[in-house]
Regions:
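Acidic, mature catalytic/reactive cores of soluble proteins
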Residues: 1-491
Length: 491
């Protein structure tokens, strides 16, 4: 308590934020929204920085470094989630954002990359020690920023005894491994000691990717990844809700360029040893032996066969693909909601393209159908990486069932176009912008200053949620046809 005042009750030690006494937040920080969300959130901030880097890369870098400083990061390595619950868990996107800002800034500020890298080693270790309860490389991160996407609040223990093994948490950690691997390889080009750390993340990625594909998260019948409820007896029950949870494994992809192994001999030697002596992981790292375009090598959770099956659903306009981007939940759940009983509690997930119909997380956020920019952006970036490996000969139907074939680069371009169209005058609607489709408060001749809403209607593209969420929806600036993040890891 305060000096000279009565001591607060002992129950304070059980309340939120009680373990964050080290915090001293007295800095200029990018806010998600100065009106509805005037507080920082670590994963929002990471996306803000990618948009900000196009106009002020110095500020973007300062923001990413700031959250890693000792007056923000917990001594155990956790990054603060957001101000009302510092100890909650958000997706680990800080490394991805640092790499993207590094790239936008011309791939020249190695000091910045090194500063962030060293602190993120602590954060990665926190994740492994705290969120992999069984030590089997399958993770349980909680709600991970996706609020009501599941049948129950993933921040809490499942209604039934056991653990929720999460497709998205495990995929995020595989992605985190690849981000830190890329950082280490970039730094190793200037300091060979980083080759040792690069090897660590190559191997750890392999362990996580193997677990992802062998411990029940992949559903062979549906061709999709799901969360799995594992009871105390070890029995697994997949929660067959087709949502962004099953698309996040696409993010775990990296391309090693053809000359990398020649330039980093220690890393190459150890990698070849691992491949030769660990045949149980061959399914995960098989494409290391199979050069793609320009001798590129592929590291990914999702191999070509599963990639094609996932994309068949993702690019289906009756499921994820809308006129204005990818929905957060398959539209198939409009006519076929997911229903089940978990621990005696009846649960249901419906397709809800607009505001949430459930009270989870206050009801003002909804991941059961709307389009959200951050994850759409990461899908697009991942497709561009796959394109670099497969080239123009590997195509999919776009949209599914149309008979029109497209390369993965063309799919990425089309998704970018659909997202940008939210803010552009629609000639088929009298010049009205889809973002304003839900309201007459904004006339058709509104000036060229559309609002960047928090999320968007899954069928119409209308802006929803916070109306000034310029932060991560500002990622639309990174979708312009310049400066794309489709490069291989070149070191």
């Amino acid at each position: 308590g305060d000096p000279g005042q009565p001591p607060p009750p002992p129950s304070r030690r059980l309340r939120r934020n009680h373990a964050w006494r080290h915090l001293n937040n007295h800095d200029v920080i990018s806010m998600p929204d100065t009106w509805e969300y005037p507080w920082y959130a670590s994963w929002d901030l990471a996306f803000h920085c990618v948009a900000l880097a196009h106009v002020d890369p110095a500020f973007a870098k300062d923001q990413l470094v700031l959250l890693c400083r000792e007056w923000f990061m917990h001594p155990n390595g956790q990054l603060p989630a957001y101000e009302w619950e510092f100890g909650d868990v958000n997706p680990p996107v800080h490394a991805w954002a640092a790499l993207r800002v590094f790239e936008i800034d011309g791939r020249r500020d190695h000091d910045f990359l090194e500063r962030v890298f060293h602190k993120l080693l602590l954060n990665f270790t926190w994740w492994v020690n705290r969120k992999d309860t069984e030590g089997n490389n399958v993770f349980q991160g909680g709600f991970l920023g996706l609020d009501n996407i599941g049948p129950f609040d993933r921040s809490q223990a499942p209604p039934a005894a056991g653990e929720l093994e999460q497709s998205d948490a495990t995929a995020w950690m595989a992605t985190y491994c690849l981000n830190l691997l890329e950082m280490a390889l970039v730094l190793a080009a200037h300091d060979p000691t980083y080759e040792d750390v690069a090897t660590k993340f190559f191997e750890h990625f392999t362990y996580i990717a193997s677990a992802m594909n062998s411990q029940g998260l992949w559903d062979e019948e549906d061709g999709f990844y799901y969360d799995v409820l594992r009871d105390d007896a070890g029995r697994q029950t997949p929660l067959r809700v087709r949502s962004m949870v099953g698309l996040i494994p696409l993010f775990a992809v990296a391309i090693l360029d053809g000359g990398l192994l020649d330039r980093l001999p220690d890393f190459a030697t150890r990698m070849r040893w691992f491949v030769r002596h660990k045949p149980q992981f061959a399914a995960v790292i098989d494409h290391i032996h199979q050069p793609g375009q320009a001798d590129a090598r592929l590291l990914s959770i999702v191999g070509p066969e599963r990639l094609r099956r996932i994309l068949t659903r993702m690019l289906d306009e009756t499921e994820f693909l809308s006129d204005h981007g990818l929905r957060s939940l398959s539209r198939a759940h409009l006519d076929h909601p997911w229903e089940g009983e978990i621990g005696g509690t009846a649960c249901r997930v419906d397709y809800e393209p607009a505001e949430s119909a459930t009270p989870l997380f206050g009801g003002n956020s909804n991941w059961r159908g709307p389009v959200w920019f951050p994850l759409n952006h990461l899908v697009i970036e991942s497709l561009r990486r796959y394109q670099r490996y497969f080239g123009d000969s590997w195509t999919v139907e776009l949209p599914t069932g149309s008979g029109v074939q497209a390369t993965l680069g063309e799919v990425a371009d089309e998704l970018s176009r659909r997202l940008r169209s939210i803010f552009l005058p629609d000639p088929h609607a009298g010049g009205r912008r889809p973002v304003f489709a839900a309201t007459r408060a904004f006339p058709p001749d509104w000036p060229d200053d559309p609002l960047f809403f928090e999320y968007f209607h899954g069928d119409t593209g209308a802006g929803l949620g916070a109306s000034h969420q310029t932060g991560w929806t500002g990622l639309v600036a990174d979708l312009a046809p310049f400066g794309r993040a489709d490069a291989a890891i070149a070191g």
